[in-house]
Swiss-Prot record:
Signal sequence residues: none
Keyword Transport appears in the UniProt entry: no
GO cellular component term, pick one: mitochondrion
Domain of life: Eukaryota
Record's protein name: Elongation factor Ts, mitochondrial
Function text: Associates with the EF-Tu.GDP complex and induces the exchange of GDP to GTP. It remains bound to the aminoacyl-tRNA.EF-Tu.GTP complex up to the GTP hydrolysis stage on the ribosome.
Any single GO BP term: mitochondrial translational elongation
Protein source organism: Leishmania infantum
Amino acid sequence: MPHRSLVCFAAPADKKAFMELVKTLRYRTEAPISDCSAALKETDGDMDAAMQVLRKRGAARAMKKGDRVTEHGFVVSCVGSTPASGAAIVTICSETDFAARNEHFQKVCVQARDQLCKLMDATNGAVLANPEEAVKHLSDVMAEELRVAIAVLGENMRVRSIAPLVPAPHMSERLLIGSYTHGSLNVDNVGRIVGLVALSQVRENEVVPKDVLTSVGRHFVATSGAEGNYAHQNFFGSETETVGKWLKQRGLKFSSSLVQEFGKEPVVHTAPEPHR
């Protein structure tokens, strides 16, 4: 009796079994159904071999799409586990807004956030000293995730930039970091605009609620285009309290802020050195 491989499925039972293999391969790789089917036929139903075929094809597609223009995407807030680890805003790009709103793209954004936070913690923030090198490092770490997403979405994707939050040198003790994300798609720390703030505690070991830090980040997002002394601005949502007064009442001093809107230059404020 002649040998019958998966290439030659004819009986209904065989077809059903083949489709189960296709379903499993798609679940594992997130590749299109047509690609999964072709890879399984090419490898006579060998799941591991089919996965290798898909990886090679995905890598080839990623290389072909690597030079295509990426003008859409989101910014991602990355805050280390301690203030010493630092904080930064990562910009992740795709070719179209449609792809940027896809769950696979947003998954890459979350992976980028987690990977950069790990690097920041492992290096005590030193990875942020050279933002361009940090982009290369993160891109290398994310190479497999980017390749898979490019293969699934059919569009180029890349880590465009990393903007670090730099505290004022004379106000680097007892630091706290706050983050606020605007225009998110129900994905934590991923949105159209991110605001980061570094604040110094006046009283050591005092617990500062997270929502206080978030409120300061929200203020700088809302007023990022404003000119003049930020300390004398009305705090966002208040008609009577200035930023300086609002912070003082909560035992905090402003050190620096960073606001990044996708596609625009970052806006930075840094506390001036006191007059001697």
